[in-house]
Amino acid sequence: MPEAGLAEAFGVTEEARAKINLALHVTGQRADGYHLLDMLVTFADCGDRLGFLPAQTDAFTLSGRFGEMLAGDGGTNLVLRARDLLREQFGALAFPVHIHLQKNLPVASGIGGGSADAAAALRGLMRLWGMSLPVEALASLALKLGADVPMCLESRPLIARGIGEEIEAVPDLPAFAMVLANPLKGVSTPEVFRRLTTKNNSALSLAPGLSGSAGWLAVIDAARNDLEPPARQLVPEIAVISAMLQARGALLTRMSGSGATCFGIFASMAEAQDAAAALHGERPDWYFQATETVSGGM
């Protein structure tokens, strides 16, 4: 369904922006097994889209390039879990709703698609139902859906620590022209963490007063994604796709999250668009998307 069609068919629509881990440091592990992370996160101007409409009974429909991959996932889909959790808060006032998810992002690909969808569902349903929750209550509810959901609620540049629930805005982070690239190979997040050789790595360090793309690019380049080496063991195509981005002129390449999506930062959107088109020509069966990330000032 085209974006214009979604807006016409559904009275309330929300964007679920792709979440990009510019840096991800694994700094420890809690007694309950959750890993402690330091992350520099931003969000892209591409992603999934959700539509919401009053209905006689609850309904959930899918479209988009990757929609079929979620078909039959009604028991575990985060959008439906978000609906049900929010309905517990609002009770009978939360009338039945038809939710449509236009799934444009690859599934389980390290760019927060499911978490962003859940966050967009929370935002959209509150608008449709004409209700709201206090900020802290909404953040607590979001965390029940997953560690990434609170930051996806924000959808702006931030630093996330702990398991992802300790969030701090980064107002000075600039926008970046970028290509997202994914070989469409699944990566098991638990297996990636299991293969980590060290789990008590150095924390993310950001100098105060950073400004400008060049300064931030140097900081990001000096940082790392501790999950990339084990992910490359599981999916060798990650190394291939990173090299392809570099060959097309990327200033910096890195894997996002637990993979397999990689990003390449380019000097301009024109260069990013040219690179994405060329890469798609080389591998039309893979995913390439030129995009621009949001700035801290938004």
UniProtKB/Swiss-Prot annotation:
Keyword Transit peptide: no
Top EC class for this record: transferase
Annotated positions binding ATP: 106-116
Keywords tagged on the record: ATP-binding, Isoprene biosynthesis, Kinase, Nucleotide-binding, Transferase
Cross-referenced Pfam families: GHMP_kinases_C (PF08544), GHMP_kinases_N (PF00288)
GO molecular function: 4-(cytidine 5'-diphospho)-2-C-methyl-D-erythritol kinase activity; ATP binding
Family: Belongs to the GHMP kinase family. IspE subfamily.
NCBIfam families, sorted: ispE (TIGR00154), PRK14608.1 (NF011202)
Name the record gives this protein: 4-diphosphocytidyl-2-C-methyl-D-erythritol kinase
Protein's organism: Rhizobium leguminosarum bv. trifolii (strain WSM2304)
